[in-house]
UniProtKB/Swiss-Prot annotation:
Binding-site residues for heme b, renumbered to this chain: 63, 92
Keywords for the protein's UniProt record, in alphabetical order: Heme, Iron, Metal-binding, Oxygen transport, Transport
Gene Ontology MF terms in the entry: haptoglobin binding; heme binding; metal ion binding; organic acid binding; oxygen binding; oxygen carrier activity; peroxidase activity
Pfam families: Globin
GO cellular component: blood microparticle; haptoglobin-hemoglobin complex; hemoglobin complex
UniProt domain Globin: residue ranges: 2-146
Subunit record text: Heterotetramer of two alpha chains and two beta chains.
Protein name: Hemoglobin subunit beta
Amino acid sequence: VHWSAEEKQLITGLWGKVNVADCGAEALARLLIVYPWTERFFSSFGNLSSPTAIIGNPMVRAHGKKVLTSFGEAVKNLDNIKNTFAQLSELHCDKLHVDPENFRLLGDILIIVLAAHFSKDFTPDCQAAWQKLVRVVAHALARKYH
């Protein structure tokens, strides 16, 4: 994947403003609320019976932070995303059996969360760079499935 200097700047510039805990929790909660079938991967998280329960669930919050922290590794390693996510791809494929389509869904949700939090900074060019990034990350995570 080739990243232009502008794309790298748009991605890293916005990432520097992201509160990983808050945006991660919001992104994972939105995924579970908007796509309720994804809850089956989080059965150990306790009460996911309503949007209020999901948003208030400390395990959702903690895992959302973990997911977005991991996503930060992609931002730090834009030129080596495939290798950065090799172990996570293996884990999600072999042990967790997560449908790789869910990576794309979470990427789309992350775009919505970023746009909501950073509306002034989230220009069409910024969105294009982030769409490319979430596609590349989703592809890297789905790699072990092929």
